């Protein structure tokens, strides 16, 4: 038994022993793991400590520039020397231990800088040390160079920068943080350029762009800092520059300022007299267009429009610029103004969109305009759904905008005769926009509309006269395009969108909306906006340039006639565009895009708009729809 039992006992003992060993080994491994982790953490700490230890000296080790700017350069030098000496000792020591490897590092260290080696030796990992050193070294030089640049522009910055560095004291971190501050400062600087002047100077962006915080007054200068900043800073200047096309970058905001100036002159705006309508249009950005659309005779009246000559001229210029250049380039207000007369020609494009008298009612427009009293003047013959949002108010001669919803071609005859028509010119007054959406090419002159549209009107309509079509497209683009985009890049986007949209026949409605813009019709901005007239649209495009002026964009409304979209569609589109342009124009504040939060139109939205049965009798209803659907 003993012999037999012995092996068993031994085997058991062995098993127990093995088990214990395994357990111990596992425990040992765990401990080792913990140790290694701790060591790694310690190394990390050391590295960070090293970086932070010499933020002053570490930062400037590699950079001579930092030393130049540094007040405590002497201390820096001392630190340098110390590392030097220690580095010599360390090097010898390291060489003993590490031999060849250390030699290589030593060589490198000599080439680069002794400071590294001491650090690396202390850390027991040259590579690790060199890494932190490298970061420190790299960041300080960049930082210093930056500081130097800033210091050149602003002496006090160097003083400020050291302070910042001290506060941040963190090697590379310090530099980065400084930069961050600088970046942030510019924005603040624009907001309170005077107060933050010092800070802005500190900021490196601030220096170059922000160094002129005061010049922020000039919207153009503000552009550099940032779109948002520019808007904030430029807003005030923008008000002054409402007439100018350049400041329009912040057009979205400018329009509101402009409308205010225009309103006083546009009080007749409600009157819708040609001048009044011009004023209102200008105010809405439609006026300019309206004038542009009006026959040549109307264009002169347009100028007289109550709207300040500036606003009119801006509109006119804008119209012209838009009409003439297919690109919808916003011509300088002056050019547009000059074009105003030419606009009659240019208007032909718009005219194409709006049959002047004939536009009154292209036969296709079956529905008599609802009773927009002023608007309906001409329109009665062709039944049209007056889109007059607030028809009642001269402000909203949407009635003038009336377009037969059923008409696929959005025939909108805005009786230029409205108050405008008298001023406009006989015969021409019924410049109702008759947009034969379907026949984008042939613009319906409408029975009533003699060539008054403009000789080119039919052709221009078909051709979407270069100026008009791009403009219109741009208008459409703005409609479909983000209203917000329009605000910021309205003009450019509008152009691009307009081109794209032009390609889409679905844009007809936009055309119709533009056609809705009746030069004669005193499409007040609100009307245009409510109608979503492309004119208002065009205004959006140009709002930047003429947003305040009244958009003069109406010419932009120039049809992109894809005559298929029914008036209702164009109505929706117009309203959408109007909403967008509303953002730009205070006149239509009632439907500001921002408030409506209107998104760019989608194909579904277009179809919805295209629905001929979708007739919104009431302007308010229309607006609601617009808000709900869009």
From Swiss-Prot:
GO biological process: one example: positive regulation of dendrite development
Biased composition, class Pro residues, residue ranges: 256-270, 361-384
Any one cellular-component term (Gene Ontology): dendrite
Region (Disordered): 142-174, 187-221, 256-331, 356-475
Entry annotated with the keyword Cell membrane: no
Tissues/organs with expression: Highly expressed in developing cortical neurons, peaking during dendrite development.
Marked site: Required for ubiquitination and degradation: 571
Low complexity: compositionally biased ranges: 385-394
Coiled-coil ranges from the UniProt annotation: none
Biased composition (Basic and acidic residues): 194-208
Xref: Pfam families: TORC_C (PF12886), TORC_M (PF12885), TORC_N (PF12884)
Positions of modified residues (Phosphoserine): 64, 113, 151
Positions where Phosphothreonine occurs in the chain: 149, 161
GO MF terms, alphabetically ordered: cAMP response element binding protein binding; transcription coactivator activity
Keyword annotations: Activator, Biological rhythms, Cytoplasm, Nucleus, Phosphoprotein, Transcription, Transcription regulation
Polar residues bias locations: 151-167, 292-301, 310-331, 414-426, 450-475
Post-translational modification: Phosphorylation/dephosphorylation states of Ser-151 are required for regulating transduction of CREB activity. TORCs are inactive when phosphorylated, and active when dephosphorylated at this site. This primary site of phosphorylation is mediated by SIKs (SIK1 and SIK2), is regulated by cAMP and calcium levels and is dependent on the phosphorylation of SIKs by LKB1.
Job description of the protein: Transcriptional coactivator for CREB1 which activates transcription through both consensus and variant cAMP response element (CRE) sites. Acts as a coactivator, in the SIK/TORC signaling pathway, being active when dephosphorylated and acts independently of CREB1 'Ser-133' phosphorylation. Enhances the interaction of CREB1 with TAF4. Regulates the expression of specific CREB-activated genes such as the steroidogenic gene, StAR. Potent coactivator of PGC1alpha and inducer of mitochondrial biogenesis in muscle cells.
Family: Belongs to the TORC family.
Oligomeric and partner information: Binds, as a tetramer, through its N-terminal region, with the bZIP domain of CREB1. 'Arg-314' in the bZIP domain of CREB1 is essential for this interaction. Interaction, via its C-terminal, with TAF4, enhances recruitment of TAF4 to CREB1. Interacts with 14-3-3 proteins, including YWHAE/14-3-3 epsilon. Interacts with calmodulin-dependent catalytic subunit PPP3CA/calcineurin A.
PANTHER family given in the database record: CREB-REGULATED TRANSCRIPTION COACTIVATOR, CREB-REGULATED TRANSCRIPTION COACTIVATOR 1
Full protein name: CREB-regulated transcription coactivator 1
Source organism of this protein record: Rattus norvegicus
């Amino acid at each position: 038994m003993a012999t037999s039992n012995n092996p068993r006992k031994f085997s058991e003992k062995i098993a127990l022993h093995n088990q214990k060993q395994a357990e111990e080994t596992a425990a040992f491994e765990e401990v080792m793991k913990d140790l290694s982790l701790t060591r790694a953490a310690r190394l990390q700490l050391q590295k960070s400590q090293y970086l932070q230890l010499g933020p002053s000296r570490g930062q400037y080790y590699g950079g001579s520039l930092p030393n130049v700017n540094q007040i405590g350069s002497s201390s820096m030098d001392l630190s340098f020397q110390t590392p030097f000496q220690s580095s010599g000792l360390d090097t010898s020591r390291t060489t003993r231990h590490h031999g060849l490897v250390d030699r290589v590092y030593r060589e490198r260290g000599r080439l680069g800088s002794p400071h590294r080696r001491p650090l690396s030796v202390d850390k027991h990992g040259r590579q690790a040390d060199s890494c932190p050193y490298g970061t420190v070294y790299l960041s300080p030089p960049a930082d210093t160079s930056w500081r130097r640049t800033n210091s050149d522009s602003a002496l006090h910055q160097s003083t400020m920068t050291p302070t910042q560095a001290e506060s941040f004291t963190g090697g590379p971190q310090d530099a980065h943080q400084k930069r961050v501050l600088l970046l942030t400062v510019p924005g603040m600087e624009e907001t309170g350029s005077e107060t933050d002047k010092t800070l802005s100077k500190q900021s490196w962006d601030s220096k170059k762009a922000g160094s002129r915080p005061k010049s922020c007054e000039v919207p153009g200068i503000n552009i550099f800092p940032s779109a948002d900043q520019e808007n904030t800073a430029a807003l005030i200047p923008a008000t002054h520059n409402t007439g100018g096309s350049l400041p329009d970058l912040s057009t979205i905001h400018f329009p509101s300022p402009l409308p205010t100036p225009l309103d006083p002159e546009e009080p007749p705006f409600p009157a819708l007299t040609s001048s009044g309508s011009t004023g209102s249009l200008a105010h809405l950005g439609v006026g300019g267009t309206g004038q542009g659309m009006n026959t040549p005779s109307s264009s002169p009246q347009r100028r007289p429009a109550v709207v300040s000559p500036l606003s009119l001229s801006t509109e006119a210029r804008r119209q012209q610029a838009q009409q003439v250049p297919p690109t919808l380039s916003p011509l300088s207000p002056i050019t547009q103004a000059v074009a105003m007369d030419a606009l009659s020609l240019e208007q032909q494009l718009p005219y194409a969109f709006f049959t002047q008298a004939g536009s009154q009612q292209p036969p296709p427009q079956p529905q008599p305009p609802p009773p927009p009293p002023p608007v309906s003047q001409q329109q009665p013959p062709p039944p049209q759904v007056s889109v007059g949002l607030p028809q009642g108010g001269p402000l909203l001669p949407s009635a003038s905008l009336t377009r037969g919803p059923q008409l696929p071609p959005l025939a909108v005859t805005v009786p230029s005769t409205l108050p405008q028509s008298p001023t406009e010119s006989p015969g021409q007054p019924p410049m109702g926009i008759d947009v034969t959406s379907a026949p984008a090419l042939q613009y319906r002159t409408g029975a009533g509309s003699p060539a008054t549209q403009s000789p080119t009107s039919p052709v221009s309509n078909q051709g979407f006269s270069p100026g008009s079509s791009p403009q219109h497209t741009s208008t459409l683009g703005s409609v479909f395009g983000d209203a917000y985009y329009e605000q910021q890049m309205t003009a450019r986007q509008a152009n691009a969108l307009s081109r794209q949209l032009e390609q889409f026949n679905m844009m007809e409605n936009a055309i119709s909306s533009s056609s809705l813009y009746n030069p004669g019709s005193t499409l007040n901005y609100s009307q245009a906006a409510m109608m979503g007239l492309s004119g208002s649209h065009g205004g959006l495009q140009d709002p930047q340039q003429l947003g305040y002026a009244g958009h003069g964009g109406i010419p932009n409304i120039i049809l992109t006639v894809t005559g298929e979209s029914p008036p209702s569609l164009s109505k929706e589109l117009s309203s959408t565009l109007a909403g967008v342009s509303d953002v730009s124009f205070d006149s239509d504040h009632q439907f500001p895009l921002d408030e409506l939060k209107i998104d760019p139109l989608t194909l579904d939205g277009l179809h919805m708009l295209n629905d001929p049965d979708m007739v919104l009798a009431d302007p308010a209803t229309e607006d609601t729809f617009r808000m709900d659907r869009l």
